[in-house]
């Protein structure tokens, strides 16, 4: 039962004489005394004694039905996987055979300026032969290059009407600033 300790002089003062729920907080009206709960009193503590925790209450360190975070487990060193590039560079061989990678360009988004060649070809001799022969002549016709006209006409310079919109704004032939950063002024510079 709730009791108030006596104060000096035997008067209670403004202290409550009964608990907030009245003498009995039993709402269902059973005359039996309330059985003490199996849980230990939370306010009672024993620093030197073992803590008594009920075995049937789940721990709240892990989410229900989920995987534990592993924070409170024994500390085991986490092994990180290291992805090292092979000495020859990265390869696209998914089967793991040791194929050396071709020489990489400076940037992967730049277009490749080389052509993959078969194993038996010699690229240097073909390139030298192609450069030494004029564009309008074939390898067998050395003297007829002057007689035949150029095989390819030069493309005309792009005009304003043939401009493609994906290449940016149309080229302008004047120096007039249409939208200056400070706003338009009444003075026109031609």
Curated annotation (Swiss-Prot):
<feature type="compositionally biased region" description="Basic and acidic residues">
    <location>
        <begin position="110"/>
        <end position="129"/>
    </location>
</feature>
<comment type="function">
    <text>Nicotinic acid adenine dinucleotide phosphate (NAADP) binding protein required for NAADP-evoked intracellular calcium release. Confers NAADP-sensitivity to the two pore channels (TPCs) complex. Enables NAADP to activate Ca(2+) release from the endoplasmic reticulum through ryanodine receptors.</text>
</comment>
<feature type="modified residue" description="Phosphoserine">
    <location>
        <position position="132"/>
    </location>
</feature>
<feature type="region of interest" description="Disordered">
    <location>
        <begin position="1"/>
        <end position="190"/>
    </location>
</feature>
<comment type="subunit">
    <text>Monomer. Dimer. Interacts with TPCN1.</text>
</comment>
<keyword id="KW-0963">Cytoplasm</keyword>
<feature type="modified residue" description="Phosphoserine">
    <location>
        <position position="45"/>
    </location>
</feature>
<keyword id="KW-0597">Phosphoprotein</keyword>
<dbReference type="Pfam" id="PF17054">
    <property type="entry name" value="JUPITER"/>
</dbReference>
<keyword id="KW-0007">Acetylation</keyword>
<feature type="modified residue" description="Phosphoserine">
    <location>
        <position position="144"/>
    </location>
</feature>
<comment type="similarity">
    <text>Belongs to the JUPITER family.</text>
</comment>
<feature type="modified residue" description="Phosphoserine">
    <location>
        <position position="97"/>
    </location>
</feature>
<dbReference type="GO" id="GO:0005634">
    <property type="term" value="C:nucleus"/>
</dbReference>
<comment type="function">
    <text>(Microbial infection) Involved in the endolysosomal trafficking of human coronavirus SARS-CoV-2.</text>
</comment>
<dbReference type="GO" id="GO:0005737">
    <property type="term" value="C:cytoplasm"/>
</dbReference>
<feature type="modified residue" description="Phosphoserine">
    <location>
        <position position="69"/>
    </location>
</feature>
<keyword id="KW-0945">Host-virus interaction</keyword>
<dbReference type="GO" id="GO:0005886">
    <property type="term" value="C:plasma membrane"/>
</dbReference>
<dbReference type="GO" id="GO:0005829">
    <property type="term" value="C:cytosol"/>
</dbReference>
<feature type="compositionally biased region" description="Basic and acidic residues">
    <location>
        <begin position="139"/>
        <end position="167"/>
    </location>
</feature>
<feature type="modified residue" description="Phosphothreonine">
    <location>
        <position position="35"/>
    </location>
</feature>
<feature type="modified residue" description="Phosphoserine">
    <location>
        <position position="30"/>
    </location>
</feature>
<feature type="modified residue" description="N-acetylmethionine">
    <location>
        <position position="1"/>
    </location>
</feature>
<dbReference type="GO" id="GO:0050848">
    <property type="term" value="P:regulation of calcium-mediated signaling"/>
</dbReference>
<dbReference type="GO" id="GO:0075509">
    <property type="term" value="P:endocytosis involved in viral entry into host cell"/>
</dbReference>
<dbReference type="InterPro" id="IPR033335">
    <property type="entry name" value="JUPITER"/>
</dbReference>
<feature type="compositionally biased region" description="Polar residues">
    <location>
        <begin position="35"/>
        <end position="44"/>
    </location>
</feature>
<keyword id="KW-0539">Nucleus</keyword>
<protein>
    <recommendedName>
        <fullName>Jupiter microtubule associated homolog 2</fullName>
    </recommendedName>
</protein>
């Amino acid at each position: 039962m709730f009791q108030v300790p006596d104060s000096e002089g035997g008067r209670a003062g403004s202290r409550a004489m009964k608990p907030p729920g009245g003498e009995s907080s039993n709402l269902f009206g059973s005359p039996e005394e309330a059985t003490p709960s199996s849980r230990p009193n939370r306010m009672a503590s024993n620093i030197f004694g073992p803590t008594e925790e009920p075995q049937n209450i789940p721990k709240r360190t892990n989410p229900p039905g989920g995987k534990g975070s592993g924070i409170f487990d024994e500390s085991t060193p986490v092994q990180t996987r290291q992805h090292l590039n092979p000495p020859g560079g990265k390869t696209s061989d998914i089967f793991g055979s040791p194929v050396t990678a071709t020489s990489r360009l400076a940037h992967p988004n730049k277009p490749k300026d080389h052509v993959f060649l078969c194993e038996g070809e010699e690229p240097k001799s073909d390139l030298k032969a192609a450069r030494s022969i004029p564009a309008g002549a074939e390898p067998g016709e050395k003297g007829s290059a002057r007689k035949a006209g150029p095989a390819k006409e030069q493309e005309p310079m792009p005009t304003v009407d043939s401009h493609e919109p994906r290449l940016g704004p149309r080229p302008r032939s004047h120096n007039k600033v249409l939208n200056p950063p400070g706003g338009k002024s009444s003075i026109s510079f031609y």
